[in-house]
């Protein structure tokens, strides 16, 4: 049953926590660095990986974030989440309410190539009309 899979996953995470954390931190830094100077987007949150988790939120300025997220998935194979992420007050404080953001969640199985593809896709989508 599923409980055995959950147990195995928790054991794996306990054994690999530091490695996973460093991997996600490195990929997050790579993505932040790739997005920091992209015109046409607002990169929500802190500018570096210090003090943040491996979630990066982007607001496509003057574009529909939902359409940008759809294009990310259908043109580039990148799964994201779009909207207010059950946190409308956080988006009000970030200045992204009511549109929300496109959220990228980086995990232990993501690769540098996937991050580079995501950055390239954001750059293209931010510049297309």
Where do the PLM segments sit?
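Pyridoxal 5′-phosphate
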Residues: 1-129
